[in-house]
Design a protein with these regions (language model features):
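Structural preference for solvent-exposed beta-strand-turn elements
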Residues: 12-450
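Ser/Thr/Pro/Gly-rich low-complexity, intrinsically disordered segments
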Residues: 1-9
């Protein structure tokens, strides 16, 4: 059995690999792995905002340190928050400032972090003061319009510093107007492009003195990441109620918490589980349990439908892949779409077609992920068809090719798994994984060496 940790310093990749490309090493036998993964990005960035809105000092443990979370941390520091960082201990202490910001002007850079972009824009849009929000070229292309429309309806003003309805912007918050409201704030919100828009307003709800009601105008009204947001809000002392159409947060005393433990990243764990499923091997990721709040736990159940067996042990869930190969299936992945790439990457090894539906929104993420799936599979000689929100992948043997990652961490990590089962797969720009899992390839190489 091979075991490794996600911690430690960044290292060079072994073999003929560099930061420009990574040549995946085909495994010659079913994998038998145990490993750790870093903390959850989604939980880390929600916890950072919740801690900043507390009225006390909050110690966060199990923090993910990656490109996304570092941009979130540096943005909080740019806004005047006192933050102590201990990367070796995966810990951060945030001195909360309650219902107000430490400063009334400033500039932040959110990089490519969608959570930082949506959450912090919402917070600044209901604060008092004027702020500039900068972003990476990738983030400048991602959807923001429903968030800006909601902020404008609340009384914020926005100056576009680039394309309209996109970052970068100069925003003057609606704090004075919101403070003078005589009753509950009400807004309409379309979350069809991203549930982060709703999570953003739920997280900042305690900044509204008489509470807030959010009416969802899109067909999609809920999702796994919204449920993470609501659960974490409750753990920090504030309840968000959903009646099927509207989300309501009553006026409350604000968030309260002195410490918080962040779960391991299930999204990152899924790549190791997928490798075991594909090769008919075994994988256990430490501290991943069925009690996790993360929606990507559904991917493990999906692998079970494809023929894998799952066992919860004291220190994590173990997956054993089928000795006779994976079964094909048709699955709606709308609620755990980050793993659509992972399923697509192992789909050629299934015994029958794999069809993934209701994932049209992934076209507007770090890249057009549906396009990335189809283009890379076809480059590998795999037959597939796509529609606006679905893809069907036929069984086949992947041929040597270079995987275009489009600077998208999930494209890189998912198609690396495909390369474990065949020769000649080269991942371009593997450094894009720094967004959420800095040493993914270091961990993988350590597992492959044994």
């Amino acid at each position: 059995m091979t075991s490794t940790s996600a911690g430690g310093e960044q290292q060079d990749y072994i073999g003929k690999n560099s930061m420009d490309s990574y040549e995946v090493k085909k495994v010659t036998a079913p994998v038998n792995w145990e490993t750790d993964v870093p903390g959850s990005k989604s939980i880390t960035n929600r916890a950072l905002l919740l801690a900043a809105l507390c009225r006390e000092q909050v110690r966060l443990q199990g923090v993910l340190f990656s490109d996304d979370s570092r941009h979130f941390l540096s943005s909080l520091q740019s806004l005047g928050y006192e933050v102590q960082i201990d990367e070796a201990a995966c810990a951060v202490e945030v001195h909360g400032h309650g219902g107000s910001l430490p400063v009334t002007s400033g500039e932040i850079h959110v990089g490519s972090a969608g959570t930082a972009a949506r959450f912090l824009t919402a917070m600044l849009g209901v604060a008092e003061g004027t702020f500039v929000i900068q972003a990476s070229e990738q983030m400048k292309k991602r959807p923001m319009k429903p968030l800006f429309e909601a902020l404008l309806s609340l009384g914020a003003s926005v100056e576009w510093l680039g394309a309209a309805w996109h970052l970068p912007v100069r925003i003057t918050g609606a704090g004075a107007h919101i403070r003078n409201l005589s009753g509950q704030a009400v807004l309409n919100l379309d979350i069809s492009e991203s549930t982060q828009f709703l999570s953003a307003f739920l997280l900042i709800a305690p900044l509204f003195p008489h509470g807030i009601r959010i009416h969802i105008t899109s067909a999609k009204t809920d999702g796994s990441y919204i449920r993470i947001t609501r659960r974490m809000m409750e753990e920090f002392g504030v309840e968000a109620v959903f009646d099927g159409c509207d989300y309501m947060v009553q006026a409350a005393g604000g968030y309260q918490r002195s410490g918080y433990q962040i779960e391991p990243d299930v999204s990152g764990a899924c790549y190791f589980y997928a490798a075991a499923a594909m090769t008919g091997g075994s994988a256990k990721v430490h501290h991943v349990h069925w009690s996790s709040m993360q929606g990507d736990m559904k991917f493990l159940k999906l692998l079970e439908q494809m023929g894998c067996t799952l066992t919860e042990e004291d220190d994590g869930i173990r997956l054993n892949g089928p000795s006779d190969g994976l079964k094909g299936l048709k699955v709606d992945m709308n609620d755990f779409s980050d793993q659509a790439l992972t399923l697509a990457a192992i789909a050629p090894y299934a015994s029958s077609d794999v069809t993934i539906t209701h994932i049209g929104h992934i076209r507007g993420q770090e890249c057009d992920r549906l396009y990335a799936i189809v283009m890379n599979l076809k480059n590998a000689g795999i037959t597939c068809e796509e529609g606006d929100d679905w893809v069907c992948i036929h069984p086949g043997k992947p041929q040597p090719c270079r995987i275009e990652t489009f600077d998208d961490h999930r494209v890189a990590m998912a198609f690396t798994v495909m390369g474990l089962g065949c020769d000649g797969i080269e991942i371009l720009n593997p450094g894009c994984c720094k967004k959420t899992f800095e040493n993914y390839f270091v961990v993988l190489d350590s597992l492959l060496k044994h």
